[in-house]
């Protein structure tokens, strides 16, 4: 038998990764995103991501838990790091950063429960790292807090034990 080592937390992170990986610049047709992410990974951006047009890294940071029988209530902060490499005819790096932040915030709030896996998702803030207007690439981060819960006895189980 294959062991089940997938926590509720991991299913939420996987849902977020799936959302960003599925993004296409021209989709949905009625209201396109305008961005297709070249690389999306769990973890911080790496040096090789500088060669990509749009890079995204999902970085979970310290999580707070409170015990509320029969649940453990969790508040997970996730940093969504991004890097955009500027092409010759693009708008300014500052505008590219704002566009990327808009797309990230839109994705994080379209389904705040991540398919009923979480209770809520809230944007906690954002930051852009721009040195000069002539920068070839721009980086930034959008912080989100995801509230979810799991069974008091099992982090894989989102259902309370009422027995």
Region annotations inferred by a language model:
Residues 67-68, 89, 131-135:
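Short helix-to-loop capping/linker segments positioned immediately adjacent to catalytic or ligand/cofactor-binding
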Residues 91-94, 155-163:
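Short, charged, solvent-exposed linker or helix-capping segments at domain edges/interfaces
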Residues 116-153:
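Glycine-rich, aromatic-bearing surface loops/beta-hairpins
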Residues 11, 71-75, 83-109:
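Extracellular/virion structural assembly segments
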Residues 110-114:
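Generic structural signal for alpha-helix termini and adjacent loop/cap motifs
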Residues 71-88, 138-154:
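Oligomerization/assembly interface segments of phage tail-like spikes and tubes
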Residues 1-70, 115-119, 158-163:
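Small/polar-rich, solvent-exposed N-terminal microdomains that initiate assembly or binding
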